Amino acid sequence: MSQHISIVTGGSRGIGRAVVDALLRRGGRVYFCSLSQESVDKALRELRRIHPDDVFAQAVDVGDESQVEAFVAEVLEQEGHVDCLVNNAGIGYFAPIDELSGEDWRRLMRTNLDGSFYMMRAVAPAMRERGEGLIVNVASLAGRHPMKGGAAYNASKFGLIGLSDAAMLDLRGDGVRVSAILPGSVATEFSSSAGDWKLQPEDVARTITGLLDFPARALPSRIELRPTSTGR
């Protein structure tokens, strides 16, 4: 029986790191990427203390089409298939619309939206050919509820939800399931304020890995995940 193979983007810290941890605990191999080589190396050292043979990583700019294609091609060459893709890589710039630079807008869209498109497009043919696979796009409740100063971030997450829904319709007939996770406030370095009420990265990771337990006939195409007590 073949190993369960997963790819996680933005996997060196925060939600992505929690997803990598959770997938490794389930068994199988995990390939993750992040933009910073230093961040990748640090996470890989820590993870290999417990999982020396089952986790692999590269520094990849998901907004670079050629880097994404090379990364996925290498995984497919090594493993022959990909069972699960988690598109988690993301950045944020927050400023009033008239103070948001074009450069910041483009960089954010390149990472948050283009990167997810490139990754899905790269894994889809192999998943379709195999007749199964799971793609999870980590969006945000900010993709449904705009916030002041969040023009670029909101737009990227609205776009990611739309992209995810369309990909779901494209791929479901071939046994490939596409789901969007919409977390509320999560306690990560990305978050601007602390708070015990916030979701933890492990909460999001548990939701994502839980999708692997659904029968093939069931497709949770969107999941909204909120803190219980307050906030979004």
Per-region residue spans from a language model:
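Residue(s) in the substrate-gating loop at a strand-loop-helix junction
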Residues: 140
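Active-site helix of classical SDR
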Residues: 120, 156
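The beta1-alpha1 cofactor-binding region of Rossmann-like NAD(H)/NADP(H)-dependent oxidoreductases
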Residues: 37-38, 59-71, 102
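Conserved glycine-rich Rossmann-like NAD(P)H-binding loop of the short-chain dehydrogenase/reductase
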Residues: 26-43
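Conserved glycine-rich cofactor-binding loop
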Residues: 12-13
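Substrate-binding pocket helix/loop in short-chain dehydrogenase/reductase
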Residues: 96-97, 104-106
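C-terminal helical subdomain
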Residues: 173-176, 180-181, 195-232
